[in-house]
């Protein structure tokens, strides 16, 4: 039995039929069923294997397209960090192959030919849960190289689990007039319900727009009617599996894009780029990695905070309850952090809304102990921002900047309809 064979697997009480797929575990057989879903089966539970049809082995070679640049279209670089948003499927075997040469991308999503001149490049090949701060820096440096070589827009293909962290990091580290669009897919390209193609079409379209800044592009609803463009410091993954999992928080989306007509509708004021500085880019990639994000809960022990301080951590984001509170029993740990010159800042677990530590005595006392309110910043954004500030500024300057807007992470006021 080889990859690509169509087989019938008989278990104790059921039977599975499908195409044999590559498996990461030698004790498991993975098959792709006709429904499009993959199933992994423990070899020890299989009573009988019947090969119904010998299949072709996965073939990834493609004939060169010999594409010529269209002088009327912008030059867009698509950088891959991993994930399945721009993968190509061998439908004979069901195997999924990363598609990141220009030819591969056009083969996978031919609609891109009408939108831009495409260049593809792999900078990482990891699951996004394995993303590290040093990889954010690598991504920023790859963006700089592409822009200096003539890219007029950047699309970053990224796994969805931590895409909002990366978007936040790039928002702080990268200063450029070129639009930088992160895009992912909730459903892989080998599934009938995949959102990959429409997302990447819309992301490339967004990258051709005369805007600047870092954004996340994903489905705007569960169907295929519209994609939303979200600002990189005001977006969060709010559902584990829905195609419209990413939402702007405390703001409306920046724009919506029809993936079929390519129409772009801006929902807020546009950040116009300065075309005279299109090849200029400044990076500030120093990050202090000794920063922690701690969720406050009933009964939380001060020893947790003391542990991080004793381990040499320089900054702590507390995700507090309500308007930004902790139990009084946690005050001892906060005092300990303050005595050791560790910056402590506060966000809220509610996600929507704003920290206001002036309303109740608990919040006022926390402020008196040096805890900095993070306004309406998302916890993940505050975490990344603190890494950035402590990596580039002295602690007193970092304290002052923590509650000030740097990259669109803080709203002066919140529209209740957001």
From Swiss-Prot:
GO annotations under biological process?
Answer: amino acid metabolic process; regulation of translational fidelity; translation
Q: Which PROSITE patterns match?
A: ASN_GLN_ASE_1 (PS00144), ASN_GLN_ASE_2 (PS00917), ASN_GLN_ASE_3 (PS51732)
Question: Which top EC class is named for this enzyme in its record?
Answer: ligase
Q: Where is the Asparaginase/glutaminase domain?
A: 74-405
User: MF terms per GO, please?
Assistant: asparaginase activity; ATP binding; glutaminyl-tRNA synthase (glutamine-hydrolyzing) activity
Reactions it catalyzes: L-glutamyl-tRNA(Gln) + L-glutamine + ATP + H2O = L-glutaminyl-tRNA(Gln) + L-glutamate + ADP + phosphate + H(+)
Matching CDD domains, A to Z? GatD (cd08962)
Where does the sequence pass through the membrane? Answer: none
InterPro entries in alphabetical order? AsnA_fam (IPR006033), Asp/glu_Ase-like_sf (IPR036152), Asparaginase/glutaminase-like (IPR006034), Asparaginase/glutaminase_AS1 (IPR020827), Asparaginase/glutaminase_AS2 (IPR027475), Asparaginase_C (IPR040919), GatD (IPR011878), GatD_N (IPR040918)
Top-level taxonomic group: Archaea
Report the leader peptide range.
none
Q: Catalytic residues per the record?
A: 84, 160-161, 237
Q: What keyword terms does UniProt attach to this protein?
A: ATP-binding, Ligase, Nucleotide-binding, Protein biosynthesis
Q: What is its EC number?
A: 6.3.5.-
Q: HAMAP family, alphabetically? A: GatD
Q: Which family does it belong to?
A: Belongs to the asparaginase 1 family. GatD subfamily.
Record's subunit section: Heterodimer of GatD and GatE.
Function field: Allows the formation of correctly charged Gln-tRNA(Gln) through the transamidation of misacylated Glu-tRNA(Gln) in organisms which lack glutaminyl-tRNA synthetase. The reaction takes place in the presence of glutamine and ATP through an activated gamma-phospho-Glu-tRNA(Gln). The GatDE system is specific for glutamate and does not act on aspartate.
**PANTHER family, per the entry:** 60 KDA LYSOPHOSPHOLIPASE (PTHR11707:SF28), L-ASPARAGINASE (PTHR11707)
- What is the official name of this protein in its record? Glutamyl-tRNA(Gln) amidotransferase subunit D
